[in-house]
Amino acid sequence: MTNGGRRLAAAAALALLVGCTEAGVRHPEPSPPASSPTQDQAASGAAAARGFHSTRSYQPTPIPVRVDIPSIHVASSLDRLGRAPDRTVQVPSRWEVAGWYAPGTRPGDPGSAVILGHVDSKRGPAVFYRLRQLRRGDAINITRADGSSVRFTVQRIEQYDKQRFPTDDVYYPTLTPTLRLVTCGGEFDATAGHYRSNVIVFATMQR
């Protein structure tokens, strides 16, 4: 991640959550050939290249459309969330529906997929009201647009002051598929009109 990406992530974290940027990948410089290939060799190489591309064609992982957490009775469709004009992460517009941070990782891909949900509303408990009740080993099921599903297992649940949001743990790339569920928690600041902390669930994909 570039220095600019780190600065952007740190700034956005103050609003609740942060965005992530793609990690750069360096490609080695090709070595010069020892001699010029013959036409037969070139044709053979071209055929091999065509075969390589045909077998390695990229199929993107379908987007998530639903989250189910049986142990705390959560069953919600997923709104797609992006970034607000000030480049902070959008929060779900509906208190009873969770949202997936679409510029980030798709559940099932290597990296940290992030799903947000409100803890309560003026009407009462919201979609992630019971998030703190999750325990290590609980299942989180994600259904994708093509009808496939992937299951994650809760590893830990933490609470952080919003001014100390763990950007690295939530958004930075991981080698394996992981999932983060985020809601508000802690003490409610009546003057500011929001909670002082975030509750974050860390989960890994079940193989």
Residue ranges and their predicted role:
Residues T21-R135, N141-S148, R156-R207:
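Solvent-exposed, non-transmembrane regions of membrane-associated and secreted proteins
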